[in-house]
Amino acid sequence: MRLRPEIVATPAYRQGRTAAADDFKLSSNENPYPPLASVVAAVGATLGGLNRYPDAGGADLRDKLAERHGVDVDQVHLGSGSVALLAQLIRAVAGAGDEVVYSWRSFEAYPGLATVAGATSVQVPNRADGGHDLPALAAAITDRTRAVIVCTLNNPTGPVVTAAEFASFMAEVPGDLLVLLDEAYHEFETDEAAVNGIPLLSRHPNLVVLRTFSKAYGLAALRIGYAVGPAAVLDAARSAALPLSVTDAARVAALASIEAEDELMERVARIAMRRDRLREALIEQGWSVPQAQGNFVWLATGEETAAASDAFSAAGLTVRAFPSEGIRISVGEHEYVERPVEVSADLGGKLPNGHPGKRLG
């Protein structure tokens, strides 16, 4: 069988491990709250039409999103999660011999998206604090670059790109180069300096902003996200999309979630408070913890990552391990903030001086 060698060599996306029956899953940055009753009812009302294809164009949801963001409806594109939209946009601009530039470590799907499009990944190392090095990212752009991905806040390390940093970056980027601003965790951000991409669209005709209903809105199982950007770019993404990939269940759940947004954002605020409490506790233990602005925190466990992951697992906590780099701990239910702190206290005490995960002083 003549398979593309670069595809064969590319690891498949690795989902966060499923927790054992009595364990707690803190590996996939899922919203710990169950769906609202109004959302469940909206989804249930679609089940009688499972024999029919979905309204994948989603005019009602696109209208709602366009209204709330102050853009034209043709500047909104729906997809089965923001990662599907990223795939479409990259396929629309990049192919063999082209480059896609992004920071690393970042979202684990980026390398595969570039490879499937036939393009080459150019990975720019993060700063020591886990944030994007935007001057280095701009310097990595060449004549072969077709897209740059900026992940803010950065998954899995946590820091945001500030509005000032992004403005300086965009001033260095060629106007015909597509910039993809991945804002999957935008609703969790509490740092007022963080960039907010959608108001910048009128200033940057080469910018597309991606959002999702998976995280803050708790619709991870239904797979729905959206892109906001220039109509011509999104038309190209639609041409690169798999047909009928957005289900009616996902669409009506998103609409119902927007109607119940106040209640959902109260949940988000509680998760952000738990996140801050978890980070502060880890810092008090002596860990060097990057800025955390999502629904997770990052521990730079380095070569001790496998042992650290095993220690969390032994305590009934399934976390996301990135071999030889670090561990991402999702913020779960209220009662499970203390349990990661208990495990990390023992781990932190064993770190040698000079370890990247150990706070100086």
From Swiss-Prot:
Reaction equations catalysed: an aromatic L-alpha-amino acid + 2-oxoglutarate = an aromatic oxo-acid + L-glutamate
Presence of keyword Phosphoprotein: no
Residue numbers of N6-(pyridoxal phosphate)lysine PTMs: K215
InterPro entries referenced in this protein's UniProt entry, alphabetically: Aminotrans_II_pyridoxalP_BS (IPR001917), Aminotransferase_I/II_large (IPR004839), ArAT (IPR024892), HistidinolP_aminotransfase (IPR050106), PyrdxlP-dep_Trfase (IPR015424), PyrdxlP-dep_Trfase_major (IPR015421), PyrdxlP-dep_Trfase_small (IPR015422)
EC annotation from Swiss-Prot or TrEMBL: 2.6.1.57
Cofactors (names): pyridoxal 5'-phosphate
CDD domains recorded: AAT_like
One Pfam family hit: Aminotran_1_2
Organism superkingdom: Bacteria
Signal sequence, renumbered to the chain: none
Gene Ontology terms, MF aspect: aromatic-amino-acid transaminase activity; pyridoxal phosphate binding
Database matches in Gene3D superfamilies: Aspartate Aminotransferase, domain 1, Type I PLP-dependent aspartate aminotransferase-like (Major domain)
Keyword annotations of the record: Aminotransferase, Pyridoxal phosphate, Transferase
Enzyme class: transferase
BP-aspect Gene Ontology terms: biosynthetic process
Role according to the record: Aminotransferase that catalyzes the conversion of aromatic amino acids and 2-oxoglutarate into corresponding aromatic oxo acids and L-glutamate.
Subunit structure as annotated in this protein's UniProt entry: Homodimer.
Family under the similarity heading: Belongs to the class-II pyridoxal-phosphate-dependent aminotransferase family.
Protein name from the UniProt record: Aromatic amino acid aminotransferase
Native source organism of the sequence: Leifsonia xyli subsp. xyli (strain CTCB07)
Gene: pat
